[in-house]
Regions:
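Helicase-associated low-complexity/disordered flanking segments
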Residues: 1-62
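Extended Lys/Arg-rich polyanion-binding regions
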Residues: 404-407, 413-428, 445-460, 474, ...
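Conserved strand-helix element at the start of the C-terminal RecA-like helicase core
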Residues: 113-117, 292-322
């Protein structure tokens, strides 16, 4: 395979288009980049160097050493470099050195998804297995999939815990006295994929992190925070907003990558018209299925990113059908990966993707984050993912080091995607967006203040650092906080933890059960259940088709049975917005702009 392998793959899929179609609107080649290597710092424990050498890492890259050295010196740092640039080494070096040298030292790793946390845990176990200096590290997962026995082991024995913001909030912070030994020895806190923490989710995570650091100070530890981020605008400021403390940034990427070919692809018009006679293009899911099938048939390891769980299932199913027409054995080389699968099913798919047992997968943004899937040849992005940062994060999953790769953005039939493929500079030359959070939002801050006061009375310094004086005063007026000489105390009997909705989710989980066997297929958020598992709905799961028999919100169960209907179902959404008052209005030529009250019916 040559440096121009991405171009070869593009020529292949273009050759597979029907005669007369010219879907490629723009092609851009991103040049290859050579590695910038560094030497191992003198402070790194010799067994850590041995461990990395056994994994084939003989010379670290410059950004890894720069970030690791800042962390070892006790300075909070964010390393913001490209996908697959080895950011994990930047925190593994100081952590392993501390764990080997200090028996009481502890480390905490925080990931936004369980898949990423388990992937990093697997990587660490492979790295340190068989090395005596690390035999008492006992790295362990602590998340919603962990059994009670494993949770107790993590709390009492593990020196490096892999968790997520949700578990940190509901368990570690809530029951911090049971974690006192761990918190007292906490030397390093890793916040991986920190660019993911934006909006309300990021604001909640910021307050969780600041509550953690507040408790650590109470127990006498002052952990160094190491952030790992995709390339973003002003990563140091974003990391500062998460913990409320200054953060150094390392942004010069020393990792190598091969030439990457980016193609902007517009599906052709169909000989039909839509609403009001509007032209209609071939659906993005159909186009993405064909591209995935063509690439897998060529042997190119491919990820196709889609916008929805149903889209992942449909794209994988469509690709499998196309491949089966060529060679039935190829159909098993593609699968869907999405949220809602059982933990063991997710782990099996991750392993198959990592080892190459699966050649292609259709996925939601669940695989946008840094799960280690090395050696991908191509990425198909089925529809603009909403931000430039997400596009480059998904695109960055492609490319073996030193070899070319292909990225194809397939435009959906909507104005934004159409504009982007016809104006490539609006995507390819646009700066990556800044991460925006607001931990001082009173609706977010209020329940966190109650949790913090439950954990440890709030001092005046705490109130000032959180910019929370007005919210605290309101909580005192409401009788939820009580002011005493020692600070602000939570009212007796108060349990505010359930009021914190970290991810802005919509209700609990509905289990999807096969009626004939009782087998659990997966789960769906109760807010999504009426649209996806209503009675009579066609439900897709891992390439199998089911019909929904019943949906019971009381028990949180949807019953389904295996079937092969010759139709599919989807939810229709009707929205009615009506202006109900005069408000403020101005005329701009033929257009009127107004700030007016409305009624919203959905």
């Amino acid at each position: 395979m040559t440096v121009g392998y991405g171009r070869e793959l593009l020529d292949l899929i273009v050759a597979g288009t029907p005669s007369g179609e010219t879907p490629v609107r723009h092609i851009c080649d991103i040049p290859a980049r050579n590695a910038e290597v560094a030497v191992w710092p003198q402070w790194v424990h010799r067994d850590a160097i041995t461990a990395f050498a056994a994994q084939g890492v003989t010379d670290p890259w410059s950004h890894q050493v720069a970030a690791a050295s800042l962390a070892f010196a006790g300075r909070h740092v964010v390393v913001a470099t490209g996908t697959a640039s080895g950011k994990s080494v930047a925190y593994q070096l100081p952590i392993l050195t501390a764990l080997a040298a200090e028996p009481r030292a502890r480390a905490l790793y925080l990931a936004p998804t369980k898949a990423l946390g388990h992937d990093q845990l697997r990587s660490i176990r492979e790295l340190i297995t068989g090395i005596d200096s690390f035999d008492r590290v006992l790295p362990c997962a602590y998340d919603g999939d962990s059994s009670n026995e494993l949770r107790r082991f993590a709390r009492e024995s593990s020196r490096w815990i892999f968790t997520n913001p949700d578990m940190m909030h509901v368990s570690l912070l809530h029951n911090h006295t049971r974690w006192s030994a761990f918190l007292r020895g906490l030397r390093y806190l890793v916040v991986d994929e920190c660019h993911y923490y934006r909006g309300v989710f990021g604001s909640n995570v910021a307050l969780v992190l600041q509550r953690l650091l507040r408790l650590c100070a109470r127990y006498g530890s002052h952990p160094t925070v190491v952030f790992a981020s995709a390339t973003t605008s002003n990563p140091g400021a974003a990391a500062h907003a998460l913990i409320g403390q200054p953060v150094e940034e390392v942004i010069a990427d020393g990792s190598p990558h091969g030439m990457r070919t980016v193609a902007l692809w517009e599906p052709p018009l169909l000989p039909i018209t839509g609403e009001n006679g509007a032209p209609v293009r071939r659906p993005v899911s159909t186009e993405a299925s064909r591209l995935l099938a063509d690439l897998v048939q060529e042997g190119a390891r491919t990820l196709t990113f889609v916008r929805s769980r149903r889209g992942a299932e449909m794209t994988a199913l469509g690709a499998a059908h196309r491949l089966a027409e060529v060679d039935p054995a190829l159909a098993s080389q593609v699968a869907a990966y999405r949220a809602g699968y059982l933990p063991e099913d997710r782990r099996a798919l991750e392993q198959a993707l990592s080892t190459g047992t699966l050649t292609g997968a259709a996925t939601t943004n669940a695989l946008e984050l840094g799960v280690d899937i090395a050696g991908l040849d191509a990425v198909v992005v089925a529809g603009f993912p909403g931000t430039v940062a997400s596009f480059w994060q998904q695109a960055g999953r492609s490319g073996r080091r030193g070899q070319g790769s292909l990225v194809v953005l397939v435009a959906r039939d909507d104005p934004l995607d159409t504009y982007l493929v016809h104006h490539p500079g609006a995507l390819l030359d646009k700066p990556i967006e800044a991460v925006v959070i607001d931990p001082t939002n009173p609706h977010v801050l209020r329940p966190h203040l109650l949790c913090a006061a439950t954990e440890l009375p709030l001092t005046e310094d705490d109130v000032r650092s959180l910019d929370a004086a007005d919210v605290v005063a309101q909580l005192v007026d409401d009788g939820l906080l009580r002011k005493r000489p020692g600070g602000y105390f939570a009212a007796p009997g108060l349990n505010p933890y359930a009021a914190v909705d970290i991810r802005g989710s919509i209700g609990g989980q509905v289990m999807i059960l096969e009626a004939d066997t009782g087998r659990v297929l997966g789960t769906v958020d109760s807010g999504r259940a009426p649209a996806t598992v209503h009675p009579g709905a066609v439900y897709l799961h891992s390439g199998e088709t089911y019909l929904v028999d019943s949906l019971d919100f009381g028990d949180g169960i949807a019953l389904v049975h295996n079937a092969t209907p010759d139709y599919s179902t989807f939810a229709r959404s009707t929205i009615d917005i009506a202006i109900t008052g005069e408000g403020e209005r101005i005329d701009l030529g033929d257009i009127q702009i107004g700030l007016v009250p409305v009624s919203y019916t959905h």
